Amino acid sequence: MKSTIFTPALNYLLRNDEKWCKAMGYFNPYLDPFKNHLRGSIPIYDLNSYRMYPNHNFVYDKLWVAQSQNLPAGELENLFTTTKKPNYPIFIKPRWGHLSAASKNCFKINNFDELSKYKHFKHMMWSEFVDGTEGMTDFIVLKGNIMHQITYKYSEKQNGFTDEYKYISSKTPTPKVISDWVTANLRDYTGIVNVQYRNNIIIEVGLRLARSGAYIIATDNHAILTNIYNVIDKNQWDYSLNDNMDFEPYYAFKCYTKMPIVYIWPQHILDLIVRSQTSRPFYEYYFEPVGREGMVFLQFMHDDLEKGMAIKKRIEFLFVLTQIITMILIVFTIVVLFSKWNCKYIFLIMMVLLYLTRFLNPHNTSYTLYKGQRQTIFGSGPPIGPEEITN
C-alpha cells in the first residue's frame, strides 16, 4: 500500500478493528457461529505460506506450474523480443502467486495489438488460453502423501473470471491428473495444497486453504479441522478420525453487481437480510473486482441450489436498488443546496449522517471496498516481483 497522509490513520483503524467490532457487536463469521476452528500454526495467506515453506514455495511460480505440465508459456517481456509468436488467444497474468490476488492483472489477449498495452508490465507471464469451467481442490498432505481432499465444483456460468457459486461436498472426486501432479511434485511436503485448474490443467497453486479456510470452517467438522492441526503442528495423522470426515454438502454463492457501489448496508442490516434468508451462518462482505465490468460484493451459503440462487438474485436486486436510491438522494441533496429552502442545511446534515451509516461496518470491510473500487477505476498497476518484497 502506497503511503499517503491518510496512512497513519488508516493503519490505526485497521489495527483496532477487532476492538471496534467487539464494541459494535459485529460477529466474526470465521469464529462465532462454529464449535470447531482452525488452530495452531496453519498459514492463512499466501505470503505467509511462501515464507513458511521455503523448500516448496516454488509452486508459487505460475510459469513453473505451466511448464511442469508442458503448457506453452513464457515470460511476457520475451514476447516483445522474439520472432516466434504464440498462437492467440493467450492468457497473461502475474507470475508470482504469493504477490498477487484474485484476478488482478489477468487478461485474455486475442492479438499482438492488445498485448502491446501491457509491454511495460514486469513480472508477468503468458500461457496458452485454457477455456472451460474452473475447479479447485484443497489437499491435506503428510510427507508427500495425500491424506484427504475436498474438491470445490464451480458453476458453469461465470461473471468474468469469477464463479456464481461453488458446490462443496466431501464426496466430489478430484481429477486424477491433478492429484497425480501433487504427488509427483510435492513428494516430501507436509501441509495444505490448494490447486486451481481448468479442464484438468493447473493454473495456480498455493500452500494454504481456499478463501482463508472459510469453506473448511463452514463444515464445522471436528475430524477435518483436528487432522489439519495434527498434520501441520504435530506432523502426524489420526486415522481414528477417518470415518468422521464427511459433512453435509452446501453451496457458497457470490453476489455480483455491475452497478457502481456508493453505499453498503451497515453490518447489522446485512445480518437481518442474510439471516432471514438462510440458516447457514457464514456470510460476509467480499469485494472482488471483475475487471472493469462489475464487482462481487457478498458471499453467503445455502444447502439448496435453487433456493440459494433465488436468494442471491433477491440480494443483488436489493443492493442495486440501494445504489439507485442513494444516487437519487445525492442528486436531490445537491439540488436542494441550490434552492432557497430555509431548512436545506438541516436536510444536508441529515443526508450526510444517513450516508455515513455505510461505515457502520468492520473497518476492514470499508478498506477492502476502497481497494476494489480503486482497482476497478484505475487498474491494478504493474505487478511486483520477489525482489521488491521486504520482510
What positions do the PLM features span?
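Cytoplasmic C-terminal tails of single-pass
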Residues: V352-L356
